[in-house]
Amino acid sequence: KTLAKHVNAIVTFSDYHRIFGQRTIQISNGVDFDSIPLKKMLSKNTSVIHLLGVAEVHYWHGYDRLIDGLGKYYQNPANTTVFFHIAGGIWKSEMHDSQHAPGFYELINKYHIEKYVIFHGQKMNEELDELFNEADFAIGSLARHRSGIDKIKTLKNREYAARGIPFVYSETDGDFDKMPYILKVPADESPIDIRRLIRFYMELDLSPCRIRDSIKNLSWKEQTMKAINNL
């Protein structure tokens, strides 16, 4: 609060017009395009879809909702085989039932979908790039509501778009909510509707390059200039 009195403005990713009595300059979380490679263009395969979630996994990522939905999907005959790949460290608390969410292991065992949920562990650089190249659709945060958050501009959403992959999330992100390659799902505890996700993906006709180009305004250069020009 004391520092706010001695600056011209406060730069924020939020929607607040004033913070600690000082005016704000609203920008978005930026993207360093030079450090994020564009994924390869894949021919659309109607018989198999590979989903990819990349995170240091916590309960607010809500991957249990995706696994639950996948289990329900496979309870009936499936024309499209769907795999869920998870790349990143996973807290032990996420693997078993907790006060926050059902455990991954419990859900996988309940539905007998062991071969459809693949844990890759932490991947970086070329190994991570290869996972993106083989993926069709990415999984963002599906449970930010569990930590009391609605509006947020996550780096992961921006990385997905910069790589050129369509994705799903449940929070409010003004930079992406109306993008044609975004599937929004309810911010609640319901299982993710895999059939809806499949339909959305199959009807989508956007190349990785077009997805990436849609967020050129989110480069750090553009966002920094926005802050400077509003001083």
Question: Where do the PLM segments sit?
Answer:
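Membrane-proximal helix-turn-helix segments that form the acceptor-binding/catalytic region
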Residues: 1-10
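Carbohydrate-associated surface elements
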Residues: 16, 30
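Nucleotide-sugar donor-binding and catalytic loop/hinge architecture
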Residues: 33-50, 74-79
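Conserved donor-binding/catalytic core segment of Leloir-type glycosyltransferases
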Residues: 42-61, 66-70, 84-87
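Nucleotide-sugar-dependent
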Residues: 61, 126-128, 138-159, 168-179
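Nucleotide-activated donor-binding/catalytic signature segment of Leloir-type glycosyltransferases, i.e.
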Residues: 88, 98-126
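A charged, aromatic-enriched C-terminal amphipathic alpha-helix characteristic of glycosyltransferases
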Residues: 189-192, 202-231
